[in-house]
Amino acid sequence: MSSSKETAKSLIQTKSRSSIRNMFDEVAPTYDFLNHLLSLGIDNYWRVVAAKKARKQVEGEREPKILDVATGTGDLAASMAKIPGAKVTGYDLSPEMLAIARKKYPNIEFHEGFAEKMPFADQSFHVVSAGFGVRNFEDLAQGMKEFHRVLKPGGCAYIIEPMIPRNPVMKKLYLIYFKNVLPKIAGMFSKSTFAYDYLPNSVEQFPQAEAFTKILKQAGFKKAEFFPMTFETSILYVATK
């Protein structure tokens, strides 16, 4: 096993906050470029889908307050900021990712910290969103409890994650791309090759569909649904407090 794959395997097992933060600090300079390249630009569409659902939910609110957790370079926060009257806050553990987010979106407020213990008051937000980040939480169950805690009654969490297709043929093609092609392409542009060995393994290890909605309900959400997107290569979870 290569040192890159060994590092990725170790990170999957520990999900150490400091190691995750260091990984994202390292990939920050090429993160946006590779995200769009490796998803063929479809990642932008997935964010729009989540923002449209959130917009419908907060319709009638004069100033909907939205928290985007694991905001990274801020793209999902920016999609949410297009909701009329929205006041959006981005939150992430990586200072390097946040530095890019602040340059890209100076009108959005960004804060640094860990999802498992957020500095926001109970019932502060109408919406909590997270794009491609919750599978990296050191303590997933505690992170979801925090999502629930900071939401207002009736508020919703919108969580986007990669999905392994259930169709056998699609699954086989997806895993070939994810495990063999993607890391090689990423290695041409990013100095952190292990991050793209970590990615497919983290997706495989993450509880998918019904398994994750069960965790959301255990965190206190009264309703949790999922919506597969783009041939089941991505999935949107919507959880209602």
UniProtKB/Swiss-Prot annotation:
Q: What is its EC number?
A: 2.1.1.163
Q: In which pathway does it act?
A: Quinol/quinone metabolism; menaquinone biosynthesis; menaquinol from 1,4-dihydroxy-2-naphthoate: step 2/2
**From what superkingdom does this record's organism come?**
Bacteria
The catalytic activity, as recorded, is: a 2-demethylmenaquinol + S-adenosyl-L-methionine = a menaquinol + S-adenosyl-L-homocysteine + H(+)
PROSITE patterns tied to this protein: SAM_MT_UBIE, UBIE_1
Q: Name one Pfam family in it.
A: Ubie_methyltran
Q: List the disulfide bonds.
A: none
- Gene3D superfamilies referenced in this protein's UniProt entry, alphabetically: Vaccinia Virus protein VP39
Q: Which InterPro entries match?
A: SAM-dependent_MTases_sf, UbiE/COQ5_MeTrFase, UbiE/COQ5_MeTrFase_CS
> CDD domains annotated for this entry?
AdoMet_MTases
| Residues that hold S-adenosyl-L-methionine according to the record | T73, D92
The alphabetical list of record keywords is: Menaquinone biosynthesis, Methyltransferase, S-adenosyl-L-methionine, Transferase
What GO biological process, any one, is recorded here?
menaquinone biosynthetic process
TM region(s), chain numbering: none
User: Key word Methyltransferase present in the record?
Assistant: yes
Q: Which GO terms describe its molecular function?
A: demethylmenaquinone methyltransferase activity
* Entry-linked PANTHER family: 2-METHOXY-6-POLYPRENYL-1,4-BENZOQUINOL METHYLASE, MITOCHONDRIAL (PTHR43591:SF24), METHYLTRANSFERASE (PTHR43591)
Functional note: Methyltransferase required for the conversion of demethylmenaquinol (DMKH2) to menaquinol (MKH2).
Which family does this protein fall into? Belongs to the class I-like SAM-binding methyltransferase superfamily. MenG/UbiE family.
Q: What is this protein called?
A: Demethylmenaquinone methyltransferase
Organism listed in the record: Chlorobaculum parvum (strain DSM 263 / NCIMB 8327)
